[in-house]
C-alpha cells in the first residue's frame, strides 16, 4: 500500500519490503502490469523475518506438512503474500495443493487459535506483537525454512538473506528458528527536496537510539548495514549523506 501511495504522491515517505519495492520499481512480479515509480530509497531500517506459525498440537512440523492445509499468506498484494507464495512454490506446493487465504495478521492469529486455519505466514520485524500475544494465549510453534529452499530464494531474489530467530524471542519458543528475512526500507518521494532528505537521513542515524524507544521492532541502524539489500536507486539527498561517510550507494 505504501508503494502505491508514494507513486501517486499521496504520501511523501513510507516503509516497504525490499523485494516488493524492487518489483514495483521495475514492473515485475505482481507489479508487471502496474509499475509504480516516483520514489527512491533512504535506508534499510530492520530485517523482516518470515515467520510461519502453527498450533503446537497441529502435527505440522515442516513446510511439506502444509499440503492440503488452510494457510493464511497475508493480505492481497502484500510483501507477506509474495514471500509466502515463493516459499510454497519452492517447496512444490502450488495453490492447488494448499488452501491459501488472505487474512491480515490479527485475523489470521484469531483463526489459528480457533482452529479455522492451520498456519499463517507473517513477514515482520521481531518481536512481532500479534505473534507474542498469540503465544501467551495458546501454544504455538514455528516452521523452519530448509537450507535448500533459502538458497533457491536468495538466488532468485538478492533481497533475501538467511536469518535465525533466536530462541526465547517469543513465549514458549525455546529453540532457534531458521528462516529468511528481507529488509524493511524507508522510502522518500521524488518530490521531497535533496536538502530535506539529506537532513532526514542524518537525523535517522544520529538519533537512532531515541527512535528505538518509539517502535516495537529492533532497529538496526548503522550506515553500512542500512544500504544492504536495496536494489533500487537512493534518493539524491540520501546519496549526499552517504557520500560524506564514504559509503557508495546506487543512484541515477
Regions flagged by a language model, labelled:
Residues 10, 15, 22-28, 56, ...:
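Sec/Tat-exported extracytoplasmic proteins
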Residues 18-20, 28-29, 58, 95-187, ...:
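Pocket-lining segment of extracytoplasmic ligand-binding domains
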Residues 23-24, 82-84, 106, 171-172, ...:
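Short, flexible segments with low predicted structural confidence
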Residues 39, 69-76, 185-191, 223-231:
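Second-shell loop/turn segments in exported
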Residues 103, 107, 114, 124-142, ...:
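An extracytoplasmic/periplasmic, membrane-proximal ligand-sensing/linker region
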Amino acid at each position: 500500500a505504501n508503494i502505491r501511495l508514494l507513486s501517486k504522491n499521496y504520501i511523501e515517505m513510507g516503509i516497504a519490503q525490499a523485494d516488493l519495492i524492487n518489483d514495483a520499481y521495475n514492473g515485475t512480479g505482481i507489479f508487471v502490469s502496474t509499475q509504480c515509480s516516483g520514489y527512491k530509497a533512504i535506508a534499510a531500517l530492520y530485517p523482516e523475518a518470515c515467520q510461519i506459525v502453527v498450533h503446537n498440537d497441529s502435527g505440522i512440523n515442516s513446510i511439506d506438512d502444509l499440503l492440503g492445509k488452510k494457510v493464511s499468506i497475508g493480505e492481497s498484494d502484500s510483501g507477506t503474500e509474495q514471500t509466502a507464495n515463493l516459499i510454497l512454490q519452492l517447496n512444490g506446493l502450488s495453490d492447488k495443493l494448499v488452501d491459501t487465504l488472505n487474512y491480515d495478521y490479527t485475523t489470521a492469529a484469531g483463526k489459528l487459535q480457533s482452529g479455522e486455519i492451520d498456519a499463517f505466514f507473517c513477514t515482520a520485524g521481531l518481536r512481532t506483537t500479534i505473534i507474542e500475544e498469540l503465544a501467551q494465549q495458546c501454544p504455538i510453534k514455528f516452521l523452519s525454512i530448509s537450507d535448500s529452499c533459502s538458497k533457491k530464494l536468495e538466488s532468485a531474489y538478492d533481497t533475501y538473506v538467511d536469518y535465525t530467530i533466536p530462541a526465547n524471542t517469543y513465549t514458549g519458543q525455546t529453540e532457534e528458528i531458521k528462516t529468511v528475512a528481507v529488509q524493511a526500507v524507508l522510502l522518500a518521494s521524488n518530490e521531497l527536496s535533496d536538502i530535506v532528505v539529506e537532513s532526514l537521513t542524518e537525523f535517522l542515524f544520529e538519533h537512532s537510539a531515541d527512535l528505538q524507544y518509539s517502535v516495537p521492532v529492533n532497529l538496526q541502524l548503522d550506515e553500512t548495514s542500512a544500504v544492504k539489500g536495496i536494489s533500487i536507486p537512493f534518493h539524491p539527498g540520501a546519496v549526499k549523506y552517504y557520500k560524506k561517510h564514504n559509503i557508495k550507494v546506487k543512484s541515477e
